């Protein structure tokens, strides 16, 4: 093992030296990159082990080394060295390690740890800027910055906040922008990738390219939702808005799926400027369960809402989840607005549950649940998550085939989200693949396997088997679903995933990462694509 380590360090030394970057030993298992801001290359077993795992805990792949950059120049120098090497060493960016199936891993390559970059220090962060041309504020952030830190910073400097969110805020900016970034605000603001003005991207050639809708648009839109295939996002210019002070958070139960989805779709169709909710989600609940789930602490632990009390509604239930934002100027009308909006919905009478909390507490709700699960040793367990975009025209078939078919009452293991989005809020020039209907649903099976559980339904094997059954049903029934945070095993499956957009994606890959070195953990390209394929 020792000789492998020596060879590995020597190999990386040679790679870096070929582009003129001086290297000096730091300790027995790390080296310092000089002249580019202090990036550090580590082969410490603890660093390598951490980079070989992710949140999913489903796969493991050890890199040769982990690189800790101080800025985009460091990232570019490393990628340029790898690009110029004889074999084209694999390079993957890692934010907070929240991938599910090894997407940010780099077996036998180098993982770039983006979590401690040059904007991660408060003294080096930029302040929000008002742009008359854009008609609003924005902020430039490091690609490895966590969204929770962006939120806290912008709130403290102008009472501002990003417009679009994910449910969990301890994710990196570059990570979510490489996928899409969605939550209950997406029906109105679009995903996070629709709320970005500009990027700096380190391409697979080691070049730092600034791009936007009008400047290098192919790279800009290709990188947004591009699964890290075209480059590493080192800077993002994020749209901001004035942050509300408080949130009225409401849940209501349905037993009729058609009424549930009709109400959801009506709510996301309401126009801005009129009376509407600011966030629309929902989830599936087994009749013997609780309306609470690990994603939030909606109710007091001393007073949970037991669904078994709904004696006349057996089987699968559906929970609508909405919020209304307000501040001092609108506090006097929030009750009236909520009452009017709820008055047009068809939930089960007597099943409306409401709470009120600060805006930040609502956005950070999942983290509070994370802390509880960590305390019980239930956070770092396998997470065989499955996220699907389902066209609205087939969501009723999906309900019959999956919620009432494959799953039945076996919904243990974690929440199952379901909520619609408006396709016109997604820019078709991005790399994200969605169903080609005006409205489509996210259906997210966010289950956790419980090691040592006496319930076989909560085992990893059982949950992965259910995932396969769900995907098989979608294929056999022609549902037309597309995976979000996709996980495919072969290039032909990726070609089917992208469909008519594959040729463009392969062309962009050949242009910006011609040696196919970046984000190989995604498993998209078996070999470097040829420009002729476009």
Curated annotation (Swiss-Prot):
<feature type="binding site">
    <location>
        <position position="103"/>
    </location>
    <ligand>
        <name>FAD</name>
    </ligand>
</feature>
<keyword id="KW-0964">Secreted</keyword>
<feature type="glycosylation site" description="N-linked (GlcNAc...) asparagine">
    <location>
        <position position="152"/>
    </location>
</feature>
<dbReference type="GO" id="GO:0009690">
    <property type="term" value="P:cytokinin metabolic process"/>
</dbReference>
<feature type="modified residue" description="Pros-8alpha-FAD histidine">
    <location>
        <position position="98"/>
    </location>
</feature>
<dbReference type="InterPro" id="IPR016166">
    <property type="entry name" value="FAD-bd_PCMH"/>
</dbReference>
<feature type="binding site">
    <location>
        <position position="97"/>
    </location>
    <ligand>
        <name>FAD</name>
    </ligand>
</feature>
<feature type="binding site">
    <location>
        <position position="93"/>
    </location>
    <ligand>
        <name>FAD</name>
    </ligand>
</feature>
<dbReference type="InterPro" id="IPR016169">
    <property type="entry name" value="FAD-bd_PCMH_sub2"/>
</dbReference>
<feature type="binding site">
    <location>
        <position position="99"/>
    </location>
    <ligand>
        <name>FAD</name>
    </ligand>
</feature>
<dbReference type="InterPro" id="IPR006094">
    <property type="entry name" value="Oxid_FAD_bind_N"/>
</dbReference>
<dbReference type="GO" id="GO:0019139">
    <property type="term" value="F:cytokinin dehydrogenase activity"/>
</dbReference>
<feature type="signal peptide">
    <location>
        <begin position="1"/>
        <end position="20"/>
    </location>
</feature>
<feature type="binding site">
    <location>
        <position position="233"/>
    </location>
    <ligand>
        <name>FAD</name>
    </ligand>
</feature>
<dbReference type="InterPro" id="IPR016164">
    <property type="entry name" value="FAD-linked_Oxase-like_C"/>
</dbReference>
<keyword id="KW-0325">Glycoprotein</keyword>
<dbReference type="InterPro" id="IPR006093">
    <property type="entry name" value="Oxy_OxRdtase_FAD_BS"/>
</dbReference>
<keyword id="KW-0732">Signal</keyword>
<dbReference type="GO" id="GO:0016491">
    <property type="term" value="F:oxidoreductase activity"/>
</dbReference>
<dbReference type="InterPro" id="IPR016167">
    <property type="entry name" value="FAD-bd_PCMH_sub1"/>
</dbReference>
<comment type="similarity">
    <text>Belongs to the oxygen-dependent FAD-linked oxidoreductase family.</text>
</comment>
<dbReference type="Pfam" id="PF01565">
    <property type="entry name" value="FAD_binding_4"/>
</dbReference>
<protein>
    <recommendedName>
        <fullName>Cytokinin dehydrogenase 5</fullName>
        <ecNumber>1.5.99.12</ecNumber>
    </recommendedName>
</protein>
<comment type="function">
    <text>Catalyzes the oxidation of cytokinins, a family of N(6)-substituted adenine derivatives that are plant hormones, where the substituent is an isopentenyl group.</text>
</comment>
<feature type="binding site">
    <location>
        <position position="182"/>
    </location>
    <ligand>
        <name>FAD</name>
    </ligand>
</feature>
<dbReference type="GO" id="GO:0005576">
    <property type="term" value="C:extracellular region"/>
</dbReference>
<feature type="binding site">
    <location>
        <position position="167"/>
    </location>
    <ligand>
        <name>FAD</name>
    </ligand>
</feature>
<feature type="glycosylation site" description="N-linked (GlcNAc...) asparagine">
    <location>
        <position position="256"/>
    </location>
</feature>
<dbReference type="InterPro" id="IPR015345">
    <property type="entry name" value="Cytokinin_DH_FAD/cytokin-bd"/>
</dbReference>
<feature type="domain" description="FAD-binding PCMH-type">
    <location>
        <begin position="59"/>
        <end position="243"/>
    </location>
</feature>
<keyword id="KW-0285">Flavoprotein</keyword>
<dbReference type="InterPro" id="IPR016170">
    <property type="entry name" value="Cytok_DH_C_sf"/>
</dbReference>
<feature type="binding site">
    <location>
        <position position="178"/>
    </location>
    <ligand>
        <name>FAD</name>
    </ligand>
</feature>
<feature type="binding site">
    <location>
        <position position="172"/>
    </location>
    <ligand>
        <name>FAD</name>
    </ligand>
</feature>
<dbReference type="InterPro" id="IPR050432">
    <property type="entry name" value="FAD-linked_Oxidoreductases_BP"/>
</dbReference>
<comment type="subunit">
    <text>Monomer.</text>
</comment>
<feature type="binding site">
    <location>
        <position position="484"/>
    </location>
    <ligand>
        <name>FAD</name>
    </ligand>
</feature>
<keyword id="KW-0560">Oxidoreductase</keyword>
<dbReference type="InterPro" id="IPR036318">
    <property type="entry name" value="FAD-bd_PCMH-like_sf"/>
</dbReference>
<dbReference type="GO" id="GO:0071949">
    <property type="term" value="F:FAD binding"/>
</dbReference>
<feature type="binding site">
    <location>
        <position position="522"/>
    </location>
    <ligand>
        <name>FAD</name>
    </ligand>
</feature>
<feature type="binding site">
    <location>
        <position position="95"/>
    </location>
    <ligand>
        <name>FAD</name>
    </ligand>
</feature>
